[in-house]
């Protein structure tokens, strides 16, 4: 009985032990489930993967065997850790016990490691574009739409943004891409190194040490750029100042983005003996400037597509606190122009290609010529709404810029024009209501007459300050003259039609007789334009006057070429016969040609052909304007010329459009530049302003009489025509006299 009871107690004790063990197992399983559920809810963006499906590039090997999370844990601690055997199979001999496992089994009955991988979220993996990066560095920037060019099916947008005082313009097929391009150009202007490797390489550190960024260390001097040592190497740069390292480190610890100017060059002056023209040779201006001011950065301000496959770049560089710009068909050419402008302005250095010699003493400084060209083209772009207007089409663009001396800071565009046509003979007017010649250079000169009349009319104003604003001052002997240092510069986008354009693409030798060019027979000859067409032909026959009835019956209306007319302005002046009653002759200081030019030949046809003119009266001279091309020559524009001419005068809001075939405005009215309008303005001035002509008497009744009243002007004009004939260059062809036989009207 006792044995039975003992065995019963023994069996009861065993069953109670098994029950306790099972309770403990259930308790451990429930705790393990709770841990897994807590982890799954906390790590929602994570997912579980088996070893066969993991991506080693994207996963983070984590272990959930321990509840502790330690900072700066070694990577080796995060490897696979199997559960202890006692935890999953106590004794290992109870196969009858079925348990649910929270994890999959594998690898011989061991639990697989729990692998957690961050989901590839778009916001976390997509790199920041230029717009976002620029906004983070410079918040609050304003992007503005500059222009929209191109056809409707393939538009080209231009968007600009101003950063650090510089305007960056980007172009693209959409506004978004143009905006992105502008942001990229702005970032390149002040972000020197896009990644750390380039920064260390540039600063002299080929490798960067491995750094634990999870440690508690605040600064990592070994991973930053090398600090500039206090200079004991000041032999090369005697004006150097050491960098304030304490200031840099303290600013870094405060976490500020720092702009600190390193005075590496001081007030160093160039070694002129080392940079003499003979030593410079054919060196690039960018290289020369870099020797004087090392470490300069060139910034691309704009990149515009003027035409298909034709781009224009504007580069800028800041030297000694001054900004210099250059433009060109490539960034390399634009950088060269900016560097040349800086060399000339700061160091008075001209490279051999820019140094005027004895044979080139009549050349205009290249940087000044480029500035005038840019002023004219930018003004035309502004008036045509970024070249989007239908009237932006042109084959030739001309403009006159007024300066005080050669200071481009005070330069002002006063007139603009475009056009390449002349009127048809059937539209000729005997009342002075049409503009006969609508070529850009000629229209620019007529617009300049409009400007001169406006300046003279200021002397009729009742306000005392108005005469002071005029470019004219009164002369004691009578009449008016230009104020001191007022200069006018003519810009033409292509060589003027006539002899200047005929020979411009070719090199002209010093000995003209040795030239083998096919047109040497007519070189320097007077030429006339083709009616309602383009191009010129040499003057034919000795007849100098056209007849009114012959033109009406079908004879071609002959107009002298632009080259010959500009040559006459260098003797007679720009003001014409009527204004000679009031002012002294006004001459051009320079002529700038955008393309198809040869400076030597241009000087010969503009000035040298009139060397035999003889002695001229007082206030008249044989003017020799300074000549220059531009660095950024305009590309050839194939296609037909537009049948209109546009003109603008300072003070006017919009362009005036003239039909080049009829010589009148597109609406049918007379242009502000026609003879009839000018004669009325002249009549209002006559008798109220002091004149240069003694005993001028009453106002003439006819336009032709007013022109003949300028006796000195007419005599110089005849003297010029005889000089052309004497040189064997042909006879100047005049319009029918009936054109000027109309009454003056007030």
From Swiss-Prot:
Region of interest called Disordered, as start-end residue ranges on this chain: 1-36, 50-105
DRBM domain mapped to chain residues: 126-192, 284-348
Highest taxon of the lineage: Eukaryota
Native source species: Rattus norvegicus (Rat)
GO MF: double-stranded RNA adenosine deaminase activity; double-stranded RNA binding; metal ion binding; tRNA-specific adenosine deaminase activity
Tissue: Brain specific.
CDD domains, per the entry: DSRM_RED2_rpt1
Biased composition (Basic residues): 20-34
Region named R-domain (ssRNA-binding): 23-35
UniProt keyword annotation of Signal present: no
Protein name in UniProt: Double-stranded RNA-specific editase B2
Span of domain A to I editase: 415-742
Keywords for the protein's UniProt record, in alphabetical order: Hydrolase, Metal-binding, mRNA processing, Nucleus, Repeat, RNA-binding, Zinc
Binding, Zn(2+): 439, 497, 562
Documented EC number(s): 3.5.-.-
Function: Lacks editing activity. It prevents the binding of other ADAR enzymes to targets in vitro, and decreases the efficiency of these enzymes. Capable of binding to dsRNA but also to ssRNA.
């Amino acid at each position: 009985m006792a044995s039975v009871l003992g065995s019963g107690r023994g069996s009861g004790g065993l069953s109670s032990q098994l029950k306790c063990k099972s309770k403990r197992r259930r308790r451990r399983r429930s705790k393990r489930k709770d841990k897994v559920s807590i982890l799954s809810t906390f790590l929602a963006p994570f997912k579980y993967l088996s070893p066969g499906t993991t991506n080693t590039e994207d996963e983070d090997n984590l272990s959930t065997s321990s509840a502790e999370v330690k900072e700066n844990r070694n990577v080796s601690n995060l490897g696979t850790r199997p559960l202890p055997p006692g935890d999953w199979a106590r004794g290992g001999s109870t196969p009858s016990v079925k348990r649910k496992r929270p994890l999959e089994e594998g690898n011989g009955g061991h639990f697989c490691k729990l692998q957690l991988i961050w989901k590839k979220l778009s916001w976390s993996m997509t790199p920041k574009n230029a717009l976002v990066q620029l906004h983070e560095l410079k918040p609050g920037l304003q992007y503005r739409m500059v222009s929209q060019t191109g056809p409707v099916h393939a538009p080209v947008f231009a968007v600009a943004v101003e950063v650090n005082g510089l305007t960056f313009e980007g172009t693209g097929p959409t506004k978004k891409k143009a905006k992105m391009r502008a942001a990229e150009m702005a970032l390149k202007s002040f972000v020197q190194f896009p990644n750390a490797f380039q920064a260390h390489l540039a600063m002299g550190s080929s490798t960067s040490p491995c750094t634990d960024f999870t440690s508690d260390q605040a600064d990592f001097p070994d991973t930053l750029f090398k600090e500039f040592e206090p200079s004991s190497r000041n032999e090369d740069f005697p004006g150097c100042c050491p960098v304030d390292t304490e200031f840099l480190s303290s600013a870094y610890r405060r976490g500020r983005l720092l702009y600190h100017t390193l005075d590496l060059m001081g007030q160093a002056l160039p070694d002129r003996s080392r940079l003499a023209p003979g030593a410079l040779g054919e060196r690039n201006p960018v290289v020369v400037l870099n020797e004087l001011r090392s470490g300069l950065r060139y910034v691309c301000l704009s990149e515009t597509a003027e035409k298909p496959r034709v781009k224009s770049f504007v580069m800028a560089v800041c030297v000694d606190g001054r900004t210099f710009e250059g433009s060109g068909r490539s960034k390399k050419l634009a950088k060269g122009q900016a560097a040349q402008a800086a060399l000339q302005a700061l160091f008075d250095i001209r490279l051999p290609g820019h140094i005027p010699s004895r044979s080139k003493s009549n050349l205009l400084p290249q940087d000044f010529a480029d500035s005038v060209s840019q002023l004219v083209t930018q003004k035309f772009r502004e008036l045509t709404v970024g070249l989007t207007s239908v009237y932006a089409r042109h084959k030739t663009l001309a403009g006159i810029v007024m300066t005080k001396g050669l200071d481009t800071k005070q330069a002002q565009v006063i007139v603009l024009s475009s056009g390449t046509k002349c009127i048809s003979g059937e539209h000729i007017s005997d009342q002075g209501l049409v503009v006969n010649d609508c070529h850009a250079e000629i229209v620019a000169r007529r617009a300049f007459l409009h400007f001169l009349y406006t300046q003279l009319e200021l002397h009729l104003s009742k306000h005392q300050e108005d005469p002071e604003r005029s470019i004219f001052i009164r002369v004691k002997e009578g009449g008016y003259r230009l104020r001191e240092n007022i200069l006018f510069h003519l810009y033409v986008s292509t060589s003027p039609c006539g002899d200047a354009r005929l020979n411009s693409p070719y090199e002209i030798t010093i000995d003209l007789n040795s030239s083998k060019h096919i047109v040497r027979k007519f070189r320097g000859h007077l030429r006339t334009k083709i009616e309602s067409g383009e191009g010129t032909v040499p003057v034919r026959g000795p007849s100098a006057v056209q007849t009114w009835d012959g033109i009406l019956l079908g004879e071609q209306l002959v107009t002298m070429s632009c080259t010959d007319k500009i040559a006459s302005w260098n003797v007679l002046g720009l003001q014409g016969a009527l204004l000679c009653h009031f002012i002294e002759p006004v001459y051009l200081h320079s002529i700038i040609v955008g393309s198809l030019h040869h400076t030597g030949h241009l000087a010969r046809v503009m000035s040298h052909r009139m060397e035999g003119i003889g002695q001229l009266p007082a206030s008249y001279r044989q003017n020799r304007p300074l000549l220059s091309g531009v660095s950024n020559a305009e590309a050839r524009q194939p296609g037909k010329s537009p049948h209109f001419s546009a003109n603008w005068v300072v003070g006017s809001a919009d362009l005036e459009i003239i039909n080049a075939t009829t010589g009148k405005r597109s609406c049918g009215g007379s242009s502000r530049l026609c003879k009839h309008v000018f004669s009325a303005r002249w009549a209002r001035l006559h008798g109220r302003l002091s004149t240069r002509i003694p005993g001028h008497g009453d106002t003439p009744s006819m336009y032709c009489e007013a022109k003949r009243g300028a006796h000195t002007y007419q005599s110089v004009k005849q003297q010029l025509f005889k000089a052309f004939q004497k040189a064997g260059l042909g006879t100047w062809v005049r319009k029918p006299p009936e054109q000027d036989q109309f009454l003056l009207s007030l």
